[in-house]
Regions:
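A structural motif at transmembrane helix-loop-helix junctions in multipass membrane proteins
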Residues: 8-11, 127-162
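Short alpha-helical transmembrane interface motifs in multi-pass membrane proteins
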Residues: 47, 55-60, 90-91, 116-124, ...
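A short amphipathic helical element positioned immediately N-terminal to and/or at the very start
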Residues: 1-5, 188-189
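Alpha-helical transmembrane segments of multi-pass membrane transporters/translocases
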Residues: 24, 187-225
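Alpha-helical transmembrane segments and their short interhelical loops
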Residues: 85-86, 93-144
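Hydrophobic alpha-helical transmembrane segments of multi-pass membrane transport/permease proteins
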Residues: 3-31, 45-61, 153-166, 204-214
Length: 225
């Protein structure tokens, strides 16, 4: 927590920007829909487009915190400490992933874009929150400095939005996008909104894919560092 407070940019990213996103969504989108062009039919798509920025933002924070600690050789020091490095990293990622989950859970309540049962929404929110450690680990595996990390975050931000194009593809070709983990999250969310029931196949594939991704990323991160 001290590292977040120490770096004002990360503080803004972790706490203020998600709030700004929520306020913008609550006020601006309904105004546009009422005064410029009707947008109600696209609210679910807009919800997915905007809510994913929350785990991506917290992933940005995790990535830079880990990079700071790597530059300060803290991760090397942890090799000889009673607490294992993996335990420390899990604590780091769990803390910010929980914060991400809280914002994601509050998002439908505070924005009003969709009406959804929060208990039914919870598995989808958990899947979205798993993007937080995923993004942070990828950035630290690929990038060797913060300049490169910014480029990686920008690229990954675009990649995780690609599954939204599935809603404009009317055949099974859309499942080619299933290699991107949050594709299954979006599919599960869309099914829940349309039917009122969970699609456990989409959820199951989503959780399995995220777990595999995180396991591979942990392995690659430890191998690099």
């Amino acid at each position: 927590m001290r590292n977040i407070i120490r770096d004002r940019l990360l503080l803004y990213s972790a706490f203020l920007i998600p709030l700004i996103i929520i306020i913008f969504t609550r006020l601006v989108i309904p105004w546009i829909s009422e005064n410029v062009a009707p947008m109600e039919q696209y609210y679910s798509l807009l919800f997915m487009l905007i809510v994913i920025t929350i785990p991506l933002m917290f992933g940005f924070v995790i990535g830079f915190l880990i990079m700071d600690e790597r530059d300060e050789n803290l991760l090397t020091v942890l090799r000889v400490m009673p607490i294992s490095r993996n335990t420390y990293l899990l604590y780091r990622m769990l803390f910010l992933s929980i914060l991400s989950l809280i914002y994601i859970m509050l998002f439908p309540l505070l924005t009003g874009l969709v009406e959804i049962n929060l208990l039914e929404y919870l598995p989808i929110a958990l899947l979205l929150a798993l993007l937080t450690p995923t993004l942070g680990l990828i950035a630290n595996i690929v990038a060797t400095n913060k300049v490169q990390a910014f480029a990686v975050f920008k690229m990954l931000g675009g990649v995780f939005y690609i599954p939204l194009f599935a809603f404009f593809i009317n055949n099974d070709l859309k499942y080619l996008l299933g290699i991107i983990p949050n594709f299954w999250t979006f599919m599960a969310f869309d099914a829940l909104l349309k039917t009122g029931n969970q699609d456990y196949l989409f959820l199951g594939i989503g959780f399995c894919l995220h777990i595999v991704f995180l396991a591979v990323l942990f392995y690659l991160f430890n191998k690099k560092n």
